[in-house]
Each structure stands twice: as structure tokens, then as C-alpha cells.
Amino acid sequence: MNRVFVFWVLIVCLPTMVANAQEDSELQRSSDEHMREELGVNPITTPSIHDTLKQLEVFRPVPVALIDAANREATFNNRFQTALHFGSLVADGFLLTLAERPQAIQDVGKALIRQSRALGVGERLTKRSKSLLEHSDKGDWAGVRQELVRTQEDVETSMLELRDEEMAHMISLGGWLRGFQLGANCTADAYSPAKARILGNVEIMDYFLDRLDTLHPRLKKTDMVTALTARVKEIRALAAEAADKTMTREQVEKIRDLANAAEDAATAKVDEEGRFEKPKN
């Protein structure tokens, strides 16, 4: 008797339960979209990894030596540089899939776990990074790329939950800057108009310059942010000189040097006030 009663209760209530679940799901999506707009998280803030890979595919041969020279073990005493470094590691992963370097990709995956923990999103990314390592070990480059896509999706979700606008933008900036630096070095070493055209996108430069300009005044005055902003402005000015034309090899070489300097500023050791530390003798 009790079972029959429960059965009919479920039959009567099920449509309402389903409708409520659908409404809750729609409310959650609406809430997420509102937070994305509020935090400035849009296709430019967190560009699609798939689209980014499509652009990076032209930068061959991959400057593997420059990627390997980076200190993946680097740690920083501030969230600004930690976020930049996280984005930089993702960009390295992009290029390494093109070079098909499984061990290097595994090293990047491990570094991503460490940096994600430093940013407070480690729990979400630990499983994702482990999956990335497994695909890399098998030489499944399509799988690696898919995991990178999912990694960025997880980061975006974490940014929404943390409501940390600056971290969202700086991770994106770090990825763009590193990808730009590697692309500029590749183009300077093996120039082609197709590569040079990709480097000339001033709109994305304007976007990140605007993001840097909205940082807290105290952070904007630090050596690291001042130097980074200055280099990006110089890169933007050189790219704008070409206007609708393709940048020449000479222009690309200048941009390469500025991109290297910008990445150096992003990864430089600084004190608690954001001042560059002097090299120890």
C-alpha cells in the first residue's frame, strides 16, 4: 500500500520537479552570464583555446629552445605575476602540442597544478592536469588540446566563483603575451608575411592595455607593471605603424626584442612593494 502511494506521489510530482530543475538550471546559466558580464569575462577576456591554437599553428618551427629556457618552477610573492605565469604556461602548452613534445608537456602540466594551487583553484585543475599528462604520455595531441580547452573552461568557472576580475584578466594577458613572444621569435627567425600579419592585431593589444590601466593605482605604480605596460605600448606603436600593411622583418625583429623585454618584466623577481630586485653578486 505504501509503495503504491509513493508511486502515485512521484507520478503527480515528477512534472513539477522536472520543471523546477529546469528553472534552477536556467537561473544558474543566467547568473553565470550576469557574472561574466559584470567581471568583464567575454570572448576577448578568455579567448577560445581552439581559436588561439588555430592562430598559433602558423608559428613553425616552434621555438622549443625558448620554451625550454623558461623556469617552470618559478614562484612569485604576488598574485599578479602568479596569474601571468599561469597564462604563460598554458601558452607554452599550446606550442608544445605543435612540436609534439610529450615530456615537456608533462612538465608544463605539473607546473600548472602548482600554479593553480597558488591561485586558489588547485582542486578543480588537479584532475584536469592529470588527464592532460595521460594524453601527452600516449601522444594523443588532439586529447591534449581538448584538455587544454577544458582547463581554460575550469579556470573561467573558478574566476566566476572567486569573483576575481584582475586574476581573470591577468591570466589571459599572460597567455597572450607569452604566445606573442614565442610567435615574434619564430617570425623573426623564419619570416613570412602570414606570421607577421598575426602579430599585427592592435585591437587585442588595446584591450590588454586597458586592463592594465584599470589595475589598482598602487599596483600600477610598481616597477613590474610600469615596465610591462611600457613594453606593450611600444609593441602596439610599432604594430600600428604598419597599419593595413604587413610588418617587415625589421619591424618584427624590433617587436621580438620588446616582447622578450615584456616577458622579462612579467617574470622578474620583485620585492613586496613590486620593485625589481637587484641581481646578487
Give a label for each model feature.
Residues 1-4:
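Positively charged n-region of N-terminal signal peptides that target proteins for export
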Residues 6-16:
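Bacterial N-terminal signal peptides
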Residues 19-21:
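Boundary at the C-terminal end of the N-terminal hydrophobic targeting segment
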Residues 23-132:
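N-terminal Sec/ER secretory leader and immediately downstream segment
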Residues 93-100, 119, 123, 158-162, ...:
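Secondary-structure edge/capping motif, primarily at the C-terminal ends of alpha-helices
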Residues 139-221:
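Extended amphipathic alpha-helical interaction segments
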Residues 216-281:
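A cross-kingdom marker for long, charged
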